Each structure stands twice: as structure tokens, then as C-alpha cells.
Amino acid sequence: MNRNSLLWLGAATLLATTGYAAAQTGAAAIGVTASVIKDVRLSNARSPKARPVVLRQRIALADLIQTGQGSQLQVLLLDRSSFSIGANATLRIDRFVYDPARGRNSGASVTRGAFRFMSGQANRANNTAISSPVATIGIRGTVLEGAVGEGAAKIAQGEVREVRQANADKRTATLVVLRGPGQRTEAGTDVGAASVTSGGVTVELTEPMMAAFVPREGAAPIGPFRISAAGLVLLEDQIFPVRVSGGGLLGGLLKALPAVLPGFGGSGNGKPQVFVPPVPVGRPSGAPGQF
């Protein structure tokens, strides 16, 4: 058994254990925290007071996760997909239905902050919907990044002229970027696709690095447009505000070739710890910026 298989076996065992504990309280575990850095808190209907999140803590449906200043989180879900969120972000998994033989159907809400979603298996049978305050984002077997709020507006304003004339709402504006897998990804993975719907209009993103921006509630998406290298770096900095000292994976790889991110993090006190799930898509062999 190779290292990746052992890592996933460990994650599955952890989820099975926490799933049993969750079942005792009526909450089914759908994932586990793979990275926790600095101030990350969780609340739900059973425990409305937000409490600190720790590494390898189970996540259940409807758990509301919030990050503080300079903080970040990665959640590994049962189907090997993952969510990463940056500082001052809010995430909730609203729906999760997974059958290994038929694929996944899941839904989540991001009401502020920057995020990355990575499909565990890069094929279009795995459908995910992410809701922001102004848009619905459909994801079909791929890797997607985005931001909600002032950070999204700042990035988009530097990308296309239409955004500067759109009177963006700095609380709810939403930027979405399709990241991959790219056409040159090995292992026969699907390129995947994403859609952004708002104001009765849907924009399709079918190529890596294509983006769309929704400036405010009721407005049609602006795009698709190709995000610049500078804009992509700004988005990456919002998703991953913390860099491991000495460079390494987070210091250089994120800006040069943002591939599927192994888990990293700490116990909530800022001290890095490591929990490394395997890369769920093929090794990139194309140009930087594609998976």
C-alpha cells in the first residue's frame, strides 16, 4: 500500500470514528479539518456559541465556520473533495450526498471571504453548488477559486473596464475563477466546467483561468474574462494569507504553480502542523497556472 493510500485510509478511519460519535448526537460527519491556522471558530444549532476549531475535527452538515484576521482553514470531505477558506471568511456545508458508484451532489454557502473548492474526482458526475449573497456557482468536476466582498471587488476592478463602471457592493460582490484541471493534466482527468448565475443570466466558464464577476444583487455576471497573473496572485493571497516560514510549499508553489494543496496547518494557535492528503488529480504537465 502506497503513502497516498495510507493517508486516505487514515482520513477514512478518522471520519468513521467521528461519524459514529456524531451519530450519537444526531449529526452526521461529512468531513474533517485538514488545516487550521490561527483563529477559526465553529457554531451550529446544537452549539450556537462559536468555539475554536482544532486540527482533525469532524465537520457536520450546517456547521457554520468562521475565520478571523490572518487565519485560514482546509476541510477534507468524505469524497476526497476539499474546501479552503482564507481570513475573515464564512463557510457552511448545506448539502452533501455521496455515492462512490454514482458521484457526489453537494452544496455550500460562502457569505464572505476567499475560498478554493477542489473536486475529489475530476469528472462531471460530481456536481457542487456554492451560493454567495449575490450568485449561484455550479461546479462540475474541477477546481475553482473565488472571493466574496471587498477583496473580490478590488481584484475585479483591476481586470476589466466594465467592473469599474458597475458600482460594486463591497459587502457582497463575488468573483469566480475556474482553475482546472487543465487540458494537459495527466491521468485522463476531465477539464470540468463552472457556471455563475445572477440576475437571471448564466455565464459558463469552460477553460482554466476564465473568470466572472457579479458586482451586486440582481446584476448579471460580467464575463467571462481571463484573469491576469497579478489578479490571480491577489486571489491566492486572500485564500492562503499565511505562509510557512522558509518558503516550501506555501512560500513559493502557490504563486508559481498553485496545484492541489496538501493539507497544512495547526491546532488553532498559529503553530504549523501537517496532515497531507494526496493530490486528487493528475500531476500538472502544462504551463504554470493550469492544473
PLM feature segments, named:
Residues 1-28, 49-54, 78, 102, ...:
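C-terminal interaction modules
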Residues 24-41:
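Short N-terminal segments immediately surrounding and downstream of signal-peptide cleavage
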Residues 31-33, 65-66, 83, 107-108, ...:
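His/acidic/aromatic-lined binding-pocket segments of jelly-roll/cupin-type domains
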Residues 34-38, 67-70, 122-124, 181-193, ...:
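A short, compositionally biased
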Residues 37-40, 70-73, 142-144:
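Generic short beta-strand segments
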Residues 45-62, 66-72, 78:
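N-terminal post-signal-peptidase region of extra-cytosolic proteins
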Residues 65-137, 146, 151-166, 192:
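Short, small-residue-rich packing micro-motifs
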Residues 119, 141-143, 198:
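Short, structured patches in soluble enzyme cores that scaffold and shape functional sites
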